[in-house]
Amino acid sequence: MAKQLCSYMFISMFILSAFLALPSAEGGATIKKCVVDVKLSKPCTFQECQPLCLQKYNGNGLCPGDDNNICACVYNC
């Protein structure tokens, strides 16, 4: 019984040390996000905004608000 307990403790310590050795997502290199507003000739729609931002900036397109002529492109700087 004591051998089994010792084995479980050793395995638990090994797994815990492996998790502690992994780099954390917070402490690593931070990815900076940029936003560009693109003025459109007509009200923004997701079907127009998303491909435009993907092609120009390799990012995501958002239409802030209703009946707005602005497409907001969010991408990694």
From Swiss-Prot:
GO CC annotation: extracellular region
UniProt keywords, alphabetically: Antimicrobial, Disulfide bond, Fungicide, Plant defense, Secreted, Signal
Species per Swiss-Prot/TrEMBL record: Arabidopsis thaliana
Name of the molecule in the record: Putative defensin-like protein 162
Signal peptide: 1-27
Compartment list: Secreted
Lineage: Eukaryota, Viridiplantae, Streptophyta, Embryophyta, Tracheophyta
Principal location: secreted
Pfam families to which the protein is assigned, alphabetical: SLR1-BP (PF07333)
Disulfide bridge partners, by residue number: 34-77, 44-63, 49-71, 53-73
Lineage top rank: taxon: Eukaryota
Sequence similarity: Belongs to the DEFL family.
One of the GO biological process terms: killing of cells of another organism
Gene: LCR37
